[in-house]
């Protein structure tokens, strides 16, 4: 299998630990081990953890805690993985073969599209649409376009909900209609829900799980839970599909890490899960207003307010390519952003705002200093939020 370069991951891997301000990150400021394992009992159990192979599908206790987040879920519906990225990877390796038609929501985290192309599938894009018709700007699904794309040859429809990079979330009505469209042709739906729980208004995004038989949900602790270093993810699927995916997992990473398993069980106890999500939402509510004010001060910028996740997709009118803009901001001011080119959306950049609030404002000012040097046309009142 020949894989194309994953441009965003390569950018972040090369630069995120070298710049002074990282606004390319889509999660929130991570916790320390001492913040997660607060009790003496948790710390004692952590230090006593044998460093052998854990259960390769993840510990039973973690299965139970994962499944409780999904309607009618049980331990048999869960496969624990090394991050949400492995959950996506083994799902594609199981479902997709050469010549299959797959539909990928765009814009999106480009892992799914890259893997599908590497597997020699026929990849069709299904774009979210900027819509202000209701008076409240949002990125919405184009269901008519999806109906036109899905055929009897469609193997799977891949969603990211809440969406990366827009921060949009789909409504329950939209999810049900997507299921109806898929059901007419027997297509699978794979829903990456790793930002679920990181909603700015505190209302949890509805899950795709339980709406249709051929659904696989992927998720993990990296984004909403601020625990990317644990590299713990999971997928939710019908039990027979979980068994098949376990077989693929045998060929990838075999098992999660024992220490990560232990800390994930701590993180997903009901009380601790509530605390972690409240912390994330608190950071988002503190930081997003500063981002919004920064955009509003600049007539050449506009955005649709994000609903979930520590990210927003900013449109700019400046006469510069998005990758060149990113490089100038990085090289001149040591701030990292994600260019719209990485989502096939030149004229935009993705801005992460989940960092320490004391770092966010100076980072934004540095981005602004570069933008101020670049020619931008006079921009009339935008239809987007300012």
PLM region spans:
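Conserved glycine-rich beta-strand-loop-beta hairpin in the small C-terminal domain of fold type I
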Residues: 265, 281-291, 303-316
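PLP-dependent enzyme catalytic core of the Aspartate aminotransferase-like
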Residues: 72, 103, 147-148, 319, ...
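Conserved core segment of the aminotransferase class I/II
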Residues: 211-285, 292-293, 365, 376
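Phosphate-binding glycine-rich loop
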Residues: 60-101, 105-108, 220, 319, ...
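Helix C-cap/helix->beta junction micro-motif
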Residues: 119, 184-185, 298, 333, ...
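PLP-dependent aspartate aminotransferase-fold enzymes
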Residues: 92-138
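N-terminal small-domain helix-loop-helix segment of the aminotransferase-like
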Residues: 1-83, 90, 270, 373-374
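Active-site phosphate-binding strand-loop segment of PLP-dependent enzymes
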Residues: 129-203
């Amino acid at each position: 299998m020949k894989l194309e370069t994953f441009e965003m991951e390569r950018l972040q891997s090369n630069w995120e630990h070298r710049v002074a301000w990282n606004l390319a990150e889509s999660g929130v400021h991570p916790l320390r081990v001492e913040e997660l394992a607060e009790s003496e009992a948790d710390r004692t159990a952590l230090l006593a953890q044998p460093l052998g192979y854990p259960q390769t599908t993840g510990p039973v206790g973690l299965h139970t805690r994962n499944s409780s987040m999904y309607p009618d879920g049980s331990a048999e519906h869960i496969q624990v993985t090394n991050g949400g990225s492995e959950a996506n990877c083994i799902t594609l390796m199981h479902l997709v073969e050469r010549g299959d038609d797959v539909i990928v929501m765009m814009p999106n985290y480009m892992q799914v599209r890259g893997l599908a192309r590497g597997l020699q599938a026929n990849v069709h894009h299904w774009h979210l649409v900027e819509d202000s018709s209701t008076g409240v700007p949002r990125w919405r699904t184009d269901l008519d376009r999806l109906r036109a794309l899905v055929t009897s040859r469609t193997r799977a429809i891949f969603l990211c909900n809440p969406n990366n990079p827009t921060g949009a979330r789909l409504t329950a009505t939209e999810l049900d209609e997507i299921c109806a469209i898929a059901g007419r042709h027997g297509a699978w739906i794979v829903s990456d829900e790793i930002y679920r729980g990181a909603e700015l208004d505190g209302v949890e995004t509805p899950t795709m799980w339980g709406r249709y038989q051929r659904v696989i949900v992927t998720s993990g602790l990296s984004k909403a839970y601020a625990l990317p270093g644990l590299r713990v993810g999971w997928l939710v699927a019908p039990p027979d599909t979980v068994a098949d995916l376990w077989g693929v997992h045998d060929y990838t990473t075999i098992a999660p890490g024992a220490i990560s398993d232990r800390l994930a069980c701590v993180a997903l106890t009901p009380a601790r899960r509530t605390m972690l999500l409240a912390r994330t939402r608190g950071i988002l509510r503190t930081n997003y207003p500063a981002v919004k004010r920064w955009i509003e001060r600049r007539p050449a910028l506009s955005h649709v307010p994000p609903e979930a996740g520590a990210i927003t997709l900013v449109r700019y009118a400046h006469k510069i390519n998005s990758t060149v803009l990113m490089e100038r901001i990085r090289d001149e001011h040591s701030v990292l952003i994600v260019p719209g080119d990485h989502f096939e959306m030149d004229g935009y950049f993705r801005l992460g705002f989940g960092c320490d609030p004391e770092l966010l404002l100076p980072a934004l000012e540095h981005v602004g200093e570069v933008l101020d040097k670049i020619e931008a046309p006079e921009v009339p009142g935008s239809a987007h939020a300012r």
